Amino acid sequence: MLAIENYLILSAILFSIGTIGVLTRRNAIVIFMCIEMMLNAVNLTFIAFSRHLGNIDGQVFVFFVMTVAAAEAAVGLALMIAFFKNRESIDVEDVNLMKL
């Protein structure tokens, strides 16, 4: 059985990769994928602490985070489709060009 430190290190690495991806990429789809990776890293932390402490609350909270992530993905994809229809691009730098 692995120690909790191993799970936390893996979670920190995944979260760092996601953060770097959000800060360095311009493609909206890649940014959303990096945000999902960050949420999964947080979920891994919740599961690790839940198992370590013998409490099920962390595992229940993961289901709420997954539900919010699914809703975020649906709304984000709808926004990207609408943006692509208008600008024929999904680069986040082009978002500033949109007028209200």
UniProtKB/Swiss-Prot annotation:
Cell cycle is among the record's keywords: no
Entry keyword annotation includes Cell membrane: yes
Recorded GO MF terms: NADH:ubiquinone reductase (non-electrogenic) activity; quinone binding
Any one GO cellular component localisation term in the record: plasma membrane
EC number: 7.1.1.-
Pfam families per the UniProt record, alphabetical: Oxidored_q2 (PF00420)
Descriptive protein name: NADH-quinone oxidoreductase subunit K 2
Gene that this sequence comes from: nuoK2
